[in-house]
Amino acid sequence: MKPEISEQPLKGLFGSESAYRVLMYLENYDNGYASQIAGTFDISLSQAQIQLKKFEELGLLVSRIEGTTRMYYFKRSPVSDALRIFLRSMLDVLPTPTIRKYYRQRRRPRRYGKR
């Protein structure tokens, strides 16, 4: 049985729950956009946008327009690489209900004809 941790210290470490959620989402799914992140965690769209913009200005994230959507990704740098290692290790010890609720969403449609 794996050890499980509380999310509370992580929220404090990153300064806010929305900052914590944004970074954990991007680490788990590799990319994302503001409304997708906001909908997953039931936070306001503006909070997700503020956090994404803040992390982009700090140099942790990069974004690009894909169609009409601004997608965010981790920037390749020693700082963001170290942060991602930390975030991945935290994802590995989150409580199982939290993992199921937030970090195991279907990202593609089901194959046609699958039963």
Each language-model region and where it sits:
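Short, cationic-aromatic polyanion-contact patches
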Residues: 8-19, 33, 66-88
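Pre-recognition alpha-helix immediately N-terminal to the DNA-recognition helix
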Residues: 17-27
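Amphipathic alpha-helical dimerization/coiled-coil segments
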Residues: 4, 79-115
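A short acidic, leucine-rich amphipathic alpha-helix
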Residues: 36-40
